[in-house]
C-alpha cells in the first residue's frame, strides 16, 4: 500500500493552552477544534495536532525522555511565498514567544531562510526558494531553479 501524503503532524506539548495560543498566533489561524485534551489546526493539505506530551507518550506506550531543548536532528518547515513573508513569519513567531536561532538571511543554496523553536523546543525552518512554487490549492511544487 502506498502512503499518498502526510495527513497529520502531532507535537507532544508541555502546556496545551500555551501551545494552542502560540500556534494560533504564529500560523494566523485559530484552531479548528480544541477539546478533550487535544488541539487540531487545519493547514493546507494536512493537520497540526497538539497533544499533551505525557498523554501522547502514554498513548504510544512509552515514556517521556527529558531531553527537551536539545536538537534531535528533526525540524519542521514552512515554505513561504517570498523573502518578505519569511521575515514577517519570523517576527510573528518571535512576538508569540519563539526563540529565533537564525535570523532571516540568504541561504548557501540560493534561498532565504530562518530558524526558530517553539515553547516546547520544536525547531522550525521558514524558507523561501526560487525552486519552490505553489499549486492553486497551496501544495508545494519543486521546479528547476533558474
Feature map (PLM): residue ranges:
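N-terminal beta-strand motif that seeds the catalytic metal site of vicinal oxygen chelate
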Residues: 1-20, 73-78, 130-146
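Vicinal oxygen chelate
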Residues: 2, 5-14, 39-42, 63-146
